[in-house]
């Protein structure tokens, strides 16, 4: 799986990230798994056409010492579909920028 990983989180960093993600995206559905909706303006043509699969998401996996973001755009509505695919360059950059901005907002240094 292609991922953006930030490791060696301190306990206080983990707590701040968990609180922020819980507040912004709802509590983790499974142990540390957060579903981050992909901005509609960066969906690929195929993803935009698949209204029955919306919203599309990135997965963030937060555990005690690391945060991992999968570069797979997926749907909660289907397991297999043409719109489920690895992120485009703009989607990948959007996710990295989102995470980097969260770290900046929370003043977490890595």
Positions of PLM-derived features:
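Short, charged/polar surface micro-motifs in flexible loops or helix N-caps
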Residues: 11-12, 40-43, 64-67
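Short, surface-exposed beta-strand/loop "edge" segments at domain boundaries and coil↔beta transitions
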Residues: 12-15, 43-45, 76-80
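C-terminal basic regulatory modules in eukaryotic proteins
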Residues: 54-110
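Ser/Thr-rich, low-complexity intrinsically disordered terminal regions
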Residues: 22-55
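Terminal, regulation- and interaction-focused segments at domain boundaries
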Residues: 1-17
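Residues in well-ordered beta-strands of folded domains
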Residues: 7, 35-37, 61, 70
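Short, intrinsically disordered, mixed-charge
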Residues: 19-27, 101-108
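Long, compositionally biased, intrinsically disordered segments
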Residues: 2-5, 29-33, 91, 101
């Amino acid at each position: 799986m292609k991922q953006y990983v930030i490791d060696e989180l301190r306990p206080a960093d983990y707590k701040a990230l968990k609180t922020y993600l819980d507040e912004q995206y709802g509590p983790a559905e499974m142990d540390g798994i957060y579903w981050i909706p992909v901005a509609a303006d960066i969906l690929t043509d195929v993803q935009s056409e698949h209204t029955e699969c919306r919203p599309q998401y990135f997965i963030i996996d937060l555990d005690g010492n690391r945060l991992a973001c999968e570069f797979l755009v997926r749907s909660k509505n289907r397991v297999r579909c043409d719109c489920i695919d690895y992120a485009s360059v703009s989607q990948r950059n959007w996710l990295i920028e989102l995470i980097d901005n969260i770290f900046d907002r929370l003043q977490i240094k890595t």
